[in-house]
């Protein structure tokens, strides 16, 4: 049996995550009391005909604070039943969460007469801290629309053809912010920028004219070789430490040229030596 626990601050996309999982064949339970996690795992093993082999539950700040504080031991009890448990934690910048609530006019579950929306979001962050600390996978939804979030969940959580650590090599642009869910970040803004070549500006790092330009730059080759050597040496150590997910982020200014080119090359090389390597371009 596989159990996916979905959590995160309100407005970060938990409902969307559950919808994706349900569409993928998971039996989904919204707002499960955290204290029932061990019982859910136990009942799933005893009554296999009652539950599907894939179950997803959401746990949020509407739980009793005492149950949320006990989440580490509750998760350990569930895993002691020899069930594969993955914790997915969704989050976004506070300003983005405020904007989402303003646009939808929904009420935050922790607001009241004495607590503003901004205060409720900060309180929620504290309450969910024990879950966030144990997340196997964190997804920052700040810059993701509904469709991008759905694709990200499918790519990172469901598209694992073989067991073991899932590696994601992701390009991004610093002008839209660093991905907060990245484990390793490499800044390639010091490399020659095709943006300043008028004939290359409208192309991306996936297009042959940009590829040819960057491949001819000695600094680009040196940077690629240094990053590649580091990753080839150390990523197997991450896998050996039983990490479920590792995200490698490559950033340039806009996320269209240099980071895309480097990310594509790294992805192809890592796929030759590691299992479960995926490539994503956040800002294309």
Curated annotation (Swiss-Prot):
Query: Which terms are listed as keywords in the entry?
Result: ATP-binding, GTP-binding, Nucleotide-binding
Q: What GO terms are given for molecular function?
A: ATP binding; GTP binding
InterPro entries named in the record:
P-loop_NTPase, RapZ-like, RapZ-like_N, RapZ_C
> Which Pfam family would be a valid example here?
RapZ-like_N
Task: Note whether Oxidoreductase occurs among the keywords.
Answer: no
User: Per its UniProt record, what Gene3D superfamilies does this chain match?
Assistant: P-loop containing nucleotide triphosphate hydrolases
**Domain of life here?**
Bacteria
| The keyword Nucleotide-binding belongs to this UniProt entry's keyword annotation | yes
- Report residues binding ATP: 8-15
- The residues the record assigns to binding GTP are 60-63
SUPFAM superfamilies associated with the record:
P-loop containing nucleoside triphosphate hydrolases
As for what it does, the entry says: Displays ATPase and GTPase activities.
Q: Which family does it belong to?
A: Belongs to the RapZ-like family.
What is the official name of this protein in its record? Nucleotide-binding protein PP_0949
């Amino acid at each position: 049996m596989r159990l996916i626990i979905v959590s995160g601050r309100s407005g970060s996309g938990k409902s969307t995550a559950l919808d994706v999982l349900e569409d993928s064949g998971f039996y989904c339970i919204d707002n499960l009391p955290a204290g029932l996690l061990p019982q859910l795992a136990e009942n799933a093993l005893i009554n296999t005909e009652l539950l599907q082999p894939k179950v997803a539950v959401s746990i949020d700040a509407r739980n009793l604070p005492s149950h949320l504080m006990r989440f580490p031991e509750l998760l350990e009890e569930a895993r002691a039943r020899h069930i594969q448990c993955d914790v997915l934690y969704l989050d976004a910048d506070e300003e983005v969460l405020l904007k989402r609530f303003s646009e939808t006019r929904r009420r935050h579950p922790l607001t009241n007469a004495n607590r503003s929306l901004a205060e409720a979001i900060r309180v929620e962050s504290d309450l969910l801290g024990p879950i966030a600390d144990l997340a196997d996978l964190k997804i920052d939804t700040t810059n993701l629309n509904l469709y991008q979030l759905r694709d990200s969940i499918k790519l990172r959580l469901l598209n694992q053809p073989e067991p073991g650590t899932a590696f994601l090599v992701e390009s991004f642009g610093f002008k839209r912010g660093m991905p907060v869910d990245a484990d390793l970040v490499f800044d390639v803004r010091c490399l020659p920028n095709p943006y300043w070549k008028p004939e290359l500006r409208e192309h991306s790092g996936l297009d042959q004219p940009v590829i040819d330009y960057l491949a001819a730059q000695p600094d680009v080759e040196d940077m690629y070789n240094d990053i590649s050597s580091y990753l080839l040496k150390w990523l197997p150590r991450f896998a050996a430490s039983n990490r479920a997910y590792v995200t490698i982020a490559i950033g340039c200014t806009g996320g269209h040229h240099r980071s895309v080119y480097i990310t594509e090359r790294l992805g192809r090389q890592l796929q030759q030596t590691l299992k479960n390597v995926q490539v994503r371009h956040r800002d294309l």
